[in-house]
C-alpha cells in the first residue's frame, strides 16, 4: 500500500485493553462479565499478554512481536483455548523466540517505559474504541485521523487516496502547473 501511494509509512501496534473492549469480548465468547472474578482474570491475562508482546518487541523487534500478537490472537479467536503464560510460551517457541530471553526482558526496567510511551500515545489520540487506527504525520503538530473499528487494507487505501485527492485539489486549482502535484512532499505517516 505504501508503494502504491508513494508514502513512507511506519506501523506501530499498541495492544490496549479497555473495560468496554473486555466486556465486548466476553459477551462475544458468552462469558459472564458481571462477576469481578471473570473481569479480574481477563484483565490479568490481558496485562500478561501485553507484557509478553512488549518483551518480544524489545528482545526481537517489532516484526517478531507482531507475529507473536497475531499468533496469540489466532489461537484465542475461536474461544476454544484460554490465555495462559504457558500458551504464550508455546507460541513464542513456535516462532523461535526463547522464553528465557523474554523472561529476563520482562524484568527489565525499560519494559515499563515502552508500555508507558504507547499508553501516552493512545491518550494523546484519545483512543477509546478498539480496534482503532490512527494516521498522523509526525512532522506536523496536531495532525491526525482517528478511525474506529476494523479496517481492511482496501479501506485504508481508499481513505488515503480520497484524503490525498481532497487535500491536493485546492492546490491544483490555484495553479495550472500540473507538475506541482507531483512535487508535493511525501509525508512520513504513522499507523497505530
Which role does the model predict for each range below?
Residues 1-79:
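Structural alpha/beta surface segment adjacent to cysteine/selenocysteine redox centers
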Amino acid at each position: 500500500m505504501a508503494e502504491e501511494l508513494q508514502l513512507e509509512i511506519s506501523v506501530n501496534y499498541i495492544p490496549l485493553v479497555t473495560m468496554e473492549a473486555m466486556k465486548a469480548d466476553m459477551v462475544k465468547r458468552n462469558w459472564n462479565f458481571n462477576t469481578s472474578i471473570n473481569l479480574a482474570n481477563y484483565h490479568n491475562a490481558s496485562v500478561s499478554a501485553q507484557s509478553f508482546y512488549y518483551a518480544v518487541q524489545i528482545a526481537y523487534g517489532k516484526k517478531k512481536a507482531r507475529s507473536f500478537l497475531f499468533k496469540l490472537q489466532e489461537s484465542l479467536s475461536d474461544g476454544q483455548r484460554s490465555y495462559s503464560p504457558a500458551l504464550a510460551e508455546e507460541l513464542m517457541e513456535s516462532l523461535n523466540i526463547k522464553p528465557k530471553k523474554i523472561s529476563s526482558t520482562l524484568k527489565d526496567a525499560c519494559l515499563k517505559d515502552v508500555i508507558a510511551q504507547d499508553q501516552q500515545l493512545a491518550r494523546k489520540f484519545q483512543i477509546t474504541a478498539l480496534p482503532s487506527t490512527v494516521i498522523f504525520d509526525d512532522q506536523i503538530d496536531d495532525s491526525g485521523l482517528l478511525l474506529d473499528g476494523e479496517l481492511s487494507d482496501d479501506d485504508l487505501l481508499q481513505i488515503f487516496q480520497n484524503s490525498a485527492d481532497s487535500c491536493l485539489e485546492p492546490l491544483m486549482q490555484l495553479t495550472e502547473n500540473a507538475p506541482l502535484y507531483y512535487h508535493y512532499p511525501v509525508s512520513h505517516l504513522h499507523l497505530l
